[in-house]
């Protein structure tokens, strides 16, 4: 294996938005040190509430490094006539200020409900709006608070705009800023027909990765879940592309399974798959 084929962060983080203290303790016990939190969820809290939350994470030696859920549903949709740029601008500024104590290596911009394009709406116009919103309203906050935002592709059942990593990369390319990239979600990517063979086409823009099993109804990755070969090919393609950022598990635990045991099994499984590409910095 070439020395160049390594992951800078070869230990997965866990998405813990909405987790109780008990679940956070189980996350720690499973082996996790890093977590991904809910951005809009935290943005709705007071500063003292965020301090309390960070204290709980610290109690379990969990470091927040990423966030998902950039926009809350209360802001409405971009293209249905209800969009209020003033209200959105106010939210963005307040959200970054409220969460300023967390250094976000990645904030994912999914929000499929907001970006759905109505029938008959010009797609080029939608893209121009999206690029303008990121460039004019979001990038200044990313610079001010030393954060990165990654555009998440979502399968067609969740939205009809930006359904592939390639499309997300087109947006990131148009924004043309080092703090804006692509969140490559293995689950959505697979559901949208992209494979490891497609990674090279958008790899330069990938700033974060989400993992869940497409075969097992978006569950956390596990041995024997039917996706092992696809995981291995995906990780190899990322390593060959020079990917050097984090991975987060964004999957659930099937009903009837032991949560703590399943989480530990997933962590052990993924760290084993990462092992050929592991570097000293984790």
Please report, for each region that a protein language model flagged, where it lies by residue.
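Histidine-acidic metal/acid-base catalytic patches
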Residues: 1-9, 13, 20-31, 89, ...
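Active-site acidic/histidine proton-transfer and metal-coordination neighborhood
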Residues: 3, 79-181, 261, 280-281
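Active-site-proximal loop/turn and secondary-structure-junction residues that shape catalytic pockets
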Residues: 18-20, 39-41, 70-73, 113-115, ...
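N-terminal substrate-binding region of glycoside hydrolase catalytic domains
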Residues: 26, 30-48, 68-76
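Glycine-rich, proline-tolerant flexible connector loops at the mouths of alpha/beta enzymes
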Residues: 36-57, 111, 118
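Active-site glycine- and acidic-residue-rich loops that bind
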Residues: 43-45, 127-129, 159-163, 184-194, ...
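A short acidic, helix-capping loop that chelates divalent metal ions and anchors anionic groups
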Residues: 73-79, 115-121, 157-158, 191-192, ...
């Amino acid at each position: 294996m070439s020395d160049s084929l390594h992951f800078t962060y070869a230990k997965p983080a866990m998405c813990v938005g909405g987790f109780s203290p008990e679940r956070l303790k189980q996350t720690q016990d499973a082996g996790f040190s890093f977590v991904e939190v809910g951005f809009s969820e935290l943005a709705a809290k007071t500063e003292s509430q965020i301090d309390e939350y960070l204290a709980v994470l610290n109690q379990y030696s969990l470091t927040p490094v990423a966030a998902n859920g950039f926009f809350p549903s209360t802001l409405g949709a971009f293209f249905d006539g209800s969009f209020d740029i003033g209200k959105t601008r106010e939210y963005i500024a307040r959200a970054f200020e409220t969460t300023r104590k967390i250094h976000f290596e990645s904030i994912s911009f999914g929000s499929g409900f907001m970006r759905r394009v109505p029938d008959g709406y010009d797609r080029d116009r939608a893209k121009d709006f999206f690029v303008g919103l990121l460039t004019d309203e979001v990038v200044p906050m990313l610079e001010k608070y030393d954060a990165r935002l990654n555009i998440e592709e979502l399968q067609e059942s969740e939205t009809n705009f930006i359904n592939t990593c390639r499309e997300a990369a087109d947006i990131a390319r148009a924004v043309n800023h080092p703090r804006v990239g692509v969140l490559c979600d293995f689950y959505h990517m697979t559901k949208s027909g992209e494979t490891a063979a497609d990674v090279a086409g958008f790899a330069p823009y990938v700033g974060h990765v989400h993992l869940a099993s497409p075969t097992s109804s978006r569950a956390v990755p596990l041995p024997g879940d039917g996706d092992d070969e696809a995981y291995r090919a995906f990780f190899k393609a990322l390593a060959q592309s020079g990917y050097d950022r984090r991975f987060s598990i964004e999957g659930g635990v099937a009903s009837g399974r032991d949560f703590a045991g399943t989480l530990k099994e997933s962590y052990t499984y993924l760290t084993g798959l990462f092992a050929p590409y592991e570097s000293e910095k984790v």
